[in-house]
Amino acid sequence: MVLSTEENTGVDSVNLPSGETGLGEKDQESVNNLCSQYEEKVRPCIDLIDSLRALGVEQDLALPAIAVIGDQSSGKSSVLEALSGVALPRGSGIVTRCPLVLKLRKLNEGEEWRGKVSYDDIEVELSDPSEVEEAINKGQNFIAGVGLGISDKLISLDVSSPNVPDLTLIDLPGITRVAVGNQPADIGRQIKRLIKTYIQKQETINLVVVPSNVDIATTEALSMAQEVDPEGDRTIGILTKPDLVDRGTEDKVVDVVRNLVYHLKKGYMIVKCRGQQDIQEQLSLTEALQNEQIFFKEHPHFRVLLEDGKATVPCLAERLTAELISHICKSLPLLENQIKESHQSASEELQKYGMDIPEDDSEKTFFLIEKINAFNQDITALVQGEENVAEGECRLFTRLRKEFLSWSKEIEKNFAKGYAVLYNEVWAFEKQYRGRELPGFVNYKTFENIIRRQIKTLEEPAIEMLHTVTEIVRAAFTSVSEKNFSEFYNLHRTTKSKLEDIRLEQEKEAEMSIRLHFKMEQIIYCQDQIYRGALQKVREEEAEEEKKTKHGTSSSSQSQDLQTSSMAEIFQHLNAYRQEAHNRISSHVPLIIQYFILKMFAERLQKGMLQLLQDKDSCSWLLKEQSDTSEKRKFLKERLARLAQARRRLAKFPG
């Protein structure tokens, strides 16, 4: 946010072109003194910004200028004319209908004046200052239409001459409140929105132009400036038309300029520029400057402002010089940070677009091989739980473990039925299947049926977990495809198609395997030594619990009945078998899912991607980029080159 070379406005403003404006020798001598001060104090900073602008850094960052705003017919154009020495369109109503960027370039002595008006793709070369006004009017009619409409499109006026300073000025449409004639009903809102886009930039010095003969408290331009610059660090008030002040109100104007009415941190200046009558009478800019000096020197109320250095265009220019120097010094560190951040951002964005696609067919094949290998490596990292993840995110395997843990808890929940429910089930089976056994003998049929029923209820939750995990893996694999192939829509689309086909097949195989496992679980079996150990552990735990019960309250009659019947024995066997079934199912189902949905899914996808290389004719088709990818990559490379050079030049700057 450095004030661009073009922002030299302040100083240069005084450097009125004698050839074009007819300045006298004394006026030119005064101007030359100011320019000497400008060269010594501001030129190094301006040269730096000029070099950045020559690099094209302005495409990436705002290099500030001076914006002139004011109510309609406040005298904005007159102030610009006085500061720059360039005659601009004038008149009543909306004169400035497009933002006008006035870029002045100082040439060496002896070089001829030249100008250029640019808008859209049109460039109009100018050979004489008198052609400027007509060219700008044509540009405004072309952009905003013939009439009173406005546009936010820029018109650029470049003026190169030995007698102008290096500076940039922006003339914005005058603020209006009521639509007139063919103006759009919301013309006022349009203009304010347009002005705000410029004056809110920290890189812009706002010159707020206010006629001396209006109540400053009601000025819309000052209110807008204060809204975007509440501390007044970038705002200078400029009072115009002091010759139109009503008699008896002069002291109020003096109070305003002395910052006693509507406070601005940077205060006010007052100038008297050429009016419409002066233009009609063909008063030259030189004569206007002389008349201004005489007016303030002889005015009984305003001459004190001249003595304070707050009146006349030369004083305004000198003030702007000082403000510009200060603003540049404040802006340089911020500009350096902006360039650094923009460089980093562009580097990160360029990485997303990857390398340029080779033109040679054989090189294209190698390029495709590299892209597919990178994709396959990322898939391998996912499967092995070694992928890189952003802060706050978790790896694929971490998410799968959460699902598997939920599955284990689902089994526990199913097996841990309430005592009363299980007691009723056991009694129901005892009544149904008990044969000739005497009390105390375990009915194996009862035991088998209860186990089978409980395990069967886990089958559908297992299938639901399979679908959940499959979707998680599919999304993860798709993200890898987007990361590697997003700019190659045919390759990305082909990968997604393969991915979906393989997913359906693997999910189907995994489901068949899980259902087969649950069919096998209907066979009640466990290794003898394992089952004995589990049963022994259950009995020991119950014995320990019984000891605690005897030391405390007496057990219920229901519990005592169980201890003396086959019910106690059945409960012990149920608990023992369920522990082993839990261990087996909670591990085996996730193993099936990992094998089919993670391992085999990944392997088949990787092989399918490598098979794409067998079709040499499809290489170019697969590597076809998005329509704007190549342009974006080129743009980012150019941007990085500009910003890298800008950083080097800033690093060498002595300030």
From Swiss-Prot:
Where in the numbering of this chain does the Dynamin-type G domain appear?
60-333
Q: What is its main location?
A: cytoplasm
Matching SUPFAM superfamilies, A to Z?
A: P-loop containing nucleoside triphosphate hydrolases
- The segment annotated G1 motif runs over 70-77
In what ranges is there compositional bias, type Low complexity? 552-562
The UniProt entry, under Pfam families, shows: Dynamin_M, Dynamin_N, GED
- A single Gene Ontology molecular function, please? GTP binding
Instruction: Report further notes.
Output: The Mx2 gene is non-functional in all laboratory mouse strains examined. It is functional in feral strains.
Q: What does this protein do?
A: Interferon-induced dynamin-like GTPase with antiviral activity against vesicular stomatitis virus (VSV) and Hantaan virus (HNTV).
This chain belongs to which protein, by name? Interferon-induced GTP-binding protein Mx2
Organism (species): Mus musculus (Mouse)
